Amino acid sequence: MQDAIQAKSALISVFNKEGLAPIVTKMHELGITLYSTGGTAAFIEAQGVPVLQVENLTSYPSILGGRVKSLHPKVFGGILNRRSNDNDQEELAQYSIPHLDIVLVDLYPFEDTVKSGASETDIIEKIDIGGISLIRAAAKNYKDVLCVSSVSDYDAFLALLERKNGKTELSDRKQFAANAFRVSSHYDTHIFNFFDEGNGALKLSYNTGKELRYGENPHQKGAFFGDFDEVFFKHHGKALSYNNLLDVDAAVQLMAEFKDDAPTFAILKHNNACGLATRDNISQAYTDALAADPVSAFGGVLIANTTIDRSTAEKINTLFCEVVIAPAFEKNALEILKQKKNRILLDLKSYPKPSTLVRSCLNGYLVQERDGITDEKSMLNEVTERKATAQEIDDLLFASKIAKHTKSNTI
């Protein structure tokens, strides 16, 4: 094992080719021999960069409609051989196996295919076999091989090539190996969860968390694991804190109960609604929601189920609040609300529907199904002598939606 290694060869097999062109161009400039397969090889050739087909190395064609391309001893021998092991090097010479110093892979998009609602047949075909094997082999042998395991590493890898002219240090290879095992474990977790279908096992996997300003208190570190941008578009304001996110989650889950109703506005503090109203227009809904508890509303999180207009924005602007959430904001409403530089303004793109709630407990975790039931008139059983009026029933159902999301004694 050498600390510094000058790369002379690379194997490239990727699904996402965005950002690949400057990488292969740079490797060619540095004299690195490129091996590749199928569509990736065709893409590299289209950049005017010479590439050797893996089939030429293995003397074996791609078979089973492309299911088996790179799974061959001449490929994995070139990756897994220990450069400092004489027996390994003798075997490579015996079987004419070249060293592979860099392995660059981007896996089939299994997670995205599941999310798209594709058929089971299509999902199964997106379980990457060769790519994941290449990643594990290259990362295992990080002392001699650099593994680039996803498109998210392309920029860092290109910068490394440019900075060190194709040379890699042990610290570089170990860092990329850590990323590779993160990618492989994340990938396998989503495959397991697809097959398990929630039958008792708990396996969670998220990519690198987003560091927050702090946790619940300033002396605590905090991070968010998930795709915030999938749910929100942030227009304005300071970075969200741990407590902000808890309130935002509570606000979104509460408003999901009213997302298809008439204009509704809610104000939350410490994860609980301190005011909520449904009216003919959003401006009046805000006024009445605030009137429920104007004291607790100070520093709260505000959410609407429809576009916030100028009239509503002018009212909100007189209140100190941390976050304002809505499906959309009128342009002049945004201009008004942006007058407070720290106020966080979020477009709600969609209502997330997490199926489970998870929290740490003792030396393990508590897991439960999220409460997805909303009370309806047909579910009610009247047991009193006096029957409720239609208005009373509507009021009770309205209150029930709010009580469902209240974490303290409901009034």
Residue spans of the language-model regions?
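Alpha-helix capping and helix-loop boundary segments enriched in small/acidic/polar residues
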Residues: L11-V14, D122, K126-I129, Y242
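Non-catalytic interface/targeting segments
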Residues: M1-L30, G39-S70, I102, A178, ...
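Active-site loops and adjacent core secondary-structure elements that bind or stabilize anionic groups
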Residues: S152-L160, K164-D371, E392-T410
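A short, charged helix-loop
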Residues: I102-E125, I129-T168, K221, G226-V231, ...
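Active-site-proximal helix-loop elements at catalytic-domain edges
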Residues: M1-S9, D86-I102, D227-L240, I373
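Active-site-adjacent beta-strand anchor residues
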Residues: S13, L34-T37, D128, C147-S150, ...
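Short beta-strand segments
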Residues: S13, L80, V103-Y108, V148-S149, ...
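Feature captures the catalytic cores and cofactor-binding loops of soluble hydro-lyases/lyases
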Residues: E18-I23, M27-K74, G78-R82, N87-P98, ...
